[in-house]
Curated annotation (Swiss-Prot):
Its cofactor is Mg(2+); K(+). InterPro entries: Pyr_Knase, Pyrv/PenolPyrv_kinase-like_dom, Pyrv_kinase-like_dom_sf, Pyrv_Knase-like_insert_dom_sf, Pyrv_Knase_AS, Pyrv_Knase_brl, Pyrv_Knase_C, Pyrv_Knase_C_sf. This is Pyruvate kinase. PANTHER family: PYRUVATE KINASE (PTHR11817). Homotetramer.
Length: 501
């Protein structure tokens, strides 16, 4: 049997003619929100457009959607997915008097209050916090972070229902509208703010393909989002963002009801000790891999490329190790939203991911997934797992999967084949959200169904082979493995074949 260590000793660091299978998500901002730049991002490797609803108006986000769709008219390529990232429930400070920044020294004692009369009258003596229950959930000795941890305070005393006495642990400035984090404290904020609900309805109206749901703490939070999306948004994938200790603690229950996961390391690294973040990342990714649910690694992956043309070596290692951990997708934030080198950042991420994919010991990974997956599995999963085994044994160059809902490609992707998964579907939405699954190359087959099922199957397989040749996946003489159904309808994927192109 192939060993992990043996695999690494023979590792090639050349990209060669291999095709990257890890998807890349790009946050779109002022530097990239035009059709021409979006085309260049797609050519560089972008698969999913991310809109950050913590910033921008509906008019602006509408322009991102319109420009993304315009880019597909200018350059066909692979289908492009669009993701809506919610602002989520959060805690913020109030407005300082005259919007002035107030410097404070270390060991400075002051008051945090939920009294609304201070909402626009904060200073270096009293700071308003918009979380009414803060005095009920926190206790003396706890730490409060302000402005992503730039300022740290220790709670000295809970004075009454509205008031905390705190002491600064470092020097800094009191500013308006800064985020507040309560590490180690269970908060009871609602899953969705009114703004979030309005944003989700905007997403449904505009046909987004997935929602990145911020600050998810419980499984019920996911169900609440699904309820707001309603019947019209039933096909929108919900990707939970794990950003706090509660989300980590409740992860197993959350994983059962979500469509996928984002390990959002920014806020997570404030809510839990920073040295623990890498271990939590590995643990959550492993659980997602075993469950067959897509997982995204995000935040500060190539942060220095916001302003520099080359990444730090640590950043490149971070991207590569996220791929090795098992991430289906990696994400860029400020690098493509406001950065000076957005195209170069995507190219760097794409090349790094491609090399990292060659470092994965595929057969031992497959064996782990097969051995740890509870039995019996569904018929579709059994066929999916068998197809990946067939790829290894036949040294096939690709899998071609006929799918209606995208579920079979998801299950094939779970078992980490070392070749592309060519997905042929008549469902454009399924084609787009399938970018969440590592290795899936989706293509939309828009011909009408043939009355003879077997004829229709062969036409779609031939279409998949044709597209795979166009994209450099296959050449004549290659061996392929195909998955199809024995009859029309959802859930009938039960036939595996080995063919020669």
């Amino acid at each position: 049997m192939e060993s992990r260590l043996g695999w690494l000793t023979d590792l090639s660091t050349e990209t060669g003619t291999n095709l990257r299978r890890t998807s890349i998500i790009c946050t779109i901002g002022p530097k990239t929100n035009n059709p021409e730049t979006l085309v260049e991002l797609r050519k560089a490797g972008m698969n999913i457009v991310r809109m950050n609803f913590s910033h921008g108006s509906y008019e602006y986000h509408q322009s991102v959607i319109d420009n993304a769709r315009k880019s597909e008219e200018l350059y066909q390529g692979r289908p492009l997915a669009i993701a809506l990232d919610t602002k989520g429930p959060e805690i913020r400070t109030g407005t300082t008097t005259n919007d002035v920044d107030y410097p404070i020294p270390p060991n400075h004692e002051m008051i945090f209050t939920t009294d609304d009369k201070y909402a626009k009258a904060c200073d270096d003596k009293t700071m308003y916090v918009d979380y009414k229950n803060i005095t009920k959930v926190i206790e003396a000795g706890r730490i409060i972070y302000v402005d992503d941890g730039v300022l740290s305070f220790e709670v000295l005393e809970v004075i009454d229902d509205n008031t905390l006495k705190v002491k600064s642990l470092n020097a800094g400035k009191i500013c308006s509208h800064k985020g507040v984090n309560l590490p180690g404290t269970d908060v009871d904020l609602p899953a969705l703010s009114e703004k979030d609900k309005s944003d989700l309805k905007f997403g449904v109206k505009n046909g987004v393909h997935m929602v990145f749901a911020s600050f998810i703490r419980t499984a019920q939070d996911v169900l609440t989002i699904r309820e707001v999306l309603g019947e019209q948004g039933k096909d929108i994938k919900i990707i939970v963002k794990i950003e706090n200790q509660q989300g980590v603690n409740n992860f197993d229950d959350i994983l059962k009801v979500t469509d996928g996961v984002m390990v959002a390391r920014g806020d997570l690294g404030i809510e839990i000790p920073a040295p623990q973040v890498f271990a939590v990342q590995k643990k959550l990714i492993a659980k997602c891999n075993l469950a067959g649910k897509p997982v995204i690694c995000a935040t500060q992956m190539l942060e220095s490329m916001t302003y520099n043309p080359r990444p730090t070596r640590a950043e490149v290692s971070d991207v590569g190790n996220a791929v090795l951990d098992g991430a289906d997708c990696v994400m860029l934030s400020g690098e493509t939203a406001k950065g000076n080198y957005p195209i170069n950042a995507v190219k760097t991420m794409a090349e790094t991911a491609l090399i990292a994919e060659q470092a994965i010991p595929y057969i031992p990974t497959y064996d782990d997934l097969r051995n740890l997956t509870p039995k019996p599995t569904s018929t579709t999963e059994t066929i999916a797992a068998a197809s990946v085994s067939a790829v290894f044994e036949q040294k096939a160059r690709a899998l071609i999967v006929l799918s209606t809902t995208g579920d079979t490609p998801r299950l094939v992707a779970k078992y980490k084949p070392n070749v592309p998964i060519v997905m042929v579907t008549r469902n454009p939405r399924a084609a787009r959200f399938s970018h969440l699954y590592r290795g899936v190359f989706p293509f939309v087959y828009d011909e009408s169904s043939d009355s003879e099922w077997t004829v229709d199957v062969e036409k779609r397989i031939n279409f998949g082979v044709k597209k795979a040749k166009e994209f450099g996946i296959l050449v004549d003489g290659d061996t392929i493995v195909t998955i199809q159904g024995f009859a029309a309808g959802v859930g009938n994927s039960n036939t595996l074949r080995v063919l020669t192109v």
